[in-house]
Amino acid sequence: MGILNKIFGTYSERELRRVNPIVNKIEALDEKMQSLKDEDFKLKTEEFKSRLEKGEKLDDILPEAFALVREAAHRTIGLKHYREQLIGGVVLHQGRIGEMKTGEGKTLVATLPAYVNALTGKGVHIVTVNDYLAKRDRDLMAPVYEFLGLKVGVILHNLNNEERQEAYGSDITYGTNSEFGFDYLRDNMVVYKEERVQRKLNFSIVDEVDSILIDEARTPLIISGQGEKSTEFYKVADYFTKSLIAEKDFTIDEKANSAMLTDEGVNKAENFFKVDNYADAENMEIQHHVVQALKANYVMKKDKDYMIKDGEILIVDEFTGRAMEGRRYSDGLHQAIEAKEGVRVERESKTLATITYQNYFRMYNKLSGMTGTAQTEENEFREIYGLDVIVIPTHEPIARIDNADVVYKSEKGKFKAIVDEIVERYKKGQPMLVGTVSIEKSEMLSSMLKKKGVPHQVLNAKYHEKEAEIISHAGEYGMVTIATNMAGRGTDIKLTKEAEEAGGLMIIGTERHESRRIDNQLRGRSGRQGDPGESRFFVSLEDDLMRIFGSERIQGIVDKLGLAEDEAIESKMVSSAIESAQKKVEGNNFDIRKTLLQYDDVINKQREIIYKQRSEVLEGEDLKDQIRDMIRDVVYTAVNSHISGVEEEFETELQNLVNYLEDICLPKALVKVKDISNLSDEEIKEKLLEAVENIYSRKEKEIGEEQIREIERVILLRVVDTKWMDHIDDMDHLKQGIGLRAYRQQDPVQAYQFEGSEMFEEMIYNIKVDTVRYLFHVEVEKAPEREKVAKETSTNYDEDSVKKQPIKKENRIGRNDMCPCGSGKKYKNCCGRMA
């Protein structure tokens, strides 16, 4: 590949040759745009819209539209897109990922494709990683769009429904990945179409695309309500797990981040929980709690994976180092950690709706993204999202010097060398950003520097409120900043003149991350827009990456050389061995994400079917035919499943059939067994269907055509939602136990697909049965007022949590009132359970 690239250029270079002629056309229009009056800009926007309506394509108007945005930006915010930014804009418009280094002006680049694609009137979403950046970018760029006659909105998590509808109705909408995803889920839980906020998903530009589409890919967005399970079992499992002996009773697999009981551990579990066979399916609950307790006690590390704040367990994001308030581990792991640390164990929640970022973003008609580091994950972007990565050239050549890694035998020797390096450079006044992998390591390094008398600032999850302030000082003369991986993405480190003269920002990596991309992000904090700078990583053979994934060859070389603790080796062979260890981990993580996607695709297809049907019910005025079909299906299926064809059983089967239908849709004693015992199966179906349809027709007349249609809609939506929530739970339980199928020589993914699809079909049938049952029992005295439904929500795993929305109701029914559906039960024990 290397030789071919030298002859033909890299893929990015070849693609850029195709983009250059378009950029030449844009630049050639510069003079024409400068001659326009201010009021002409809005008129040009109207002209473009009219040309599109007449059949021109976006690509036809692109050069002129880009040139117009370029001039508008110059007049409103004093910034003019330079050539490389125009290239970036074209790449994004083409639905690709543009790799643009830190400080290259990604926020400004997004205005180009956003404007062009907004001309279709279908909306553009610009996605950032947090509320602060969404609002900042909207405020910075709004003058450009408004000068061109477009409306700009921003979605923040404290907005109400009307404000969200207005923001989504804008031509261009800024917001965070979690807000866009949660709004999609909530839109598919409403009972009235007027409550939906989003339009169809058209075009999305994702900033920090690697962070959202890869690091967060395994993170499901979850809207949940309070679960019913007790939390006591977590404490029992924790007590049992703490009594176990490592290696003897359980083993830890650091590569897979998991722990498993040995045969001896299984014996102990059987004695402790008083069960005969621990592996039995009926003991799945015990297995689940023990697995999570093992992981909590022996795999998850305090101040690395999570921290305790005010008696609450907060997850620490492994990629950014930020504490993620409002986010909880799923599958009971969070409760297991709470039991381990002796804080209050919260109840497990019940999932009401869920989707992964992978599947949410794949729903857009066109998707594009920007980041400083994407090339290392190019295969994943292409395979999962169908996106290719184009490296955009920098405006100024990169002047940063990237030194080779230095490798030490022990962690102690490595940290001593790091402190010596910091002291040396501090004397020269060179600013330094020191990247650590955990809160614990950043605090250890901080105390070592204090002993040496080196003043410094610390940025980790414990001090994240001061993040913007700390980063704003990081480029000053003599400033030493210790940061976990968070390192303030989205905020540039600007150098003072004295700092520039002292050599620019020095990046010191105290450990290699599992992902080369995270290392590149740290490096990329230095050398922005041609600034001077330097970087170096310090590695020890005791680091997690080297210990778990490193090759024995390096250990062999170090042993042969007989290195002392504070001696280092620096060689290409060592650097390439580190890189191959990282590639191994990246490949491993990619495979995990791919497998998870295969599982998620099963429920995703089911979600699409349910949400599509739900949307049709919301939009449709008349469900009469659909309800009649349901009634027929319920009656026919009941006959088929009750009558076996065995003559001796016939009378009993008919009695069971009549009893079954009386529970759903037949009044008592309307149909007697003797009336149908001489009929064929087909005649029985017709006779029963006729009886049931006549009853429903009478009900229609009693209640009134308009009212019954509204009741059908509300009941069907309620039943669909209830059954879908239960189905999500069932699929979750199926997935938890499916891994064991490998022991039976079964492919777990195929087993999950097969059984999941059977469960889905069963759910669809149960939706029909319950809908018919509720409709036949409903009795209404007067026209029902419309109910506004907002579900109880809690967040997934994002730092900006979704707050609970109050349930607003009109004409509220008391919990102990009789249910209006006519079942004779109290409201709380009947339809109230679904509300």
Swiss-Prot record:
One of its GO terms (biological process) is protein transport by the Sec complex. The keyword Chloroplast does not apply. ATP binds at residues 85, 103-107, 492. It is a peripheral membrane protein. One of its GO terms (cellular component) is cytosol. Monomer and homodimer. Part of the essential Sec protein translocation apparatus which comprises SecA, SecYEG and auxiliary proteins SecDF. Other proteins may also be involved. This is Protein translocase subunit SecA. It comes from Clostridium botulinum (strain Kyoto / Type A2). The lineage of its organism: Bacteria, Bacillati, Bacillota, Clostridia, Eubacteriales.
